[in-house]
Design a protein with these regions (language model features):
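Short basic helix-loop element that most often maps to the first helix and adjoining turn
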Residues: 9-22, 59
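A detector for short, charged/polar N-terminal pre-domain segments
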Residues: 1-4
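Short, conserved catalytic or interaction motifs in soluble domains
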Residues: 39
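Secretory-pathway ectodomains
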Residues: 9, 28-30, 52-54
């Protein structure tokens, strides 16, 4: 399992076979938001994690999707 939120988002997006643009559209955020998540400059909110989990379930990914408790950039 990926070690940080950005890696988890990227891994999940890739497993879903989606581009950043497609993923952003599916979860109703901007492409720059997805990019910031994946590059460790921000982390998804609790609501965003819920939407991401719902998308994964709808697409048949049943892997355990826990919201990582790790801080972003040491904050």
């Amino acid at each position: 399992m990926p070690a940080n939120p950005g890696d988890l988002v990227r891994s999940l997006r890739q497993r879903l076979g989606l581009t950043q643009e497609e993923f952003a559209h599916e979860i109703a955020v901007t492409v720059s938001t997805v990019n910031r998540w994946e590059n460790g400059h921000a982390a998804p909110s609790k609501l965003a994690w819920k939407v991401i989990r719902d998308l994964a379930r709808r697409r048949g990914l049943t892997a355990h999707l826990q919201r990582p408790q790790q801080s972003v950039n040491g904050r």
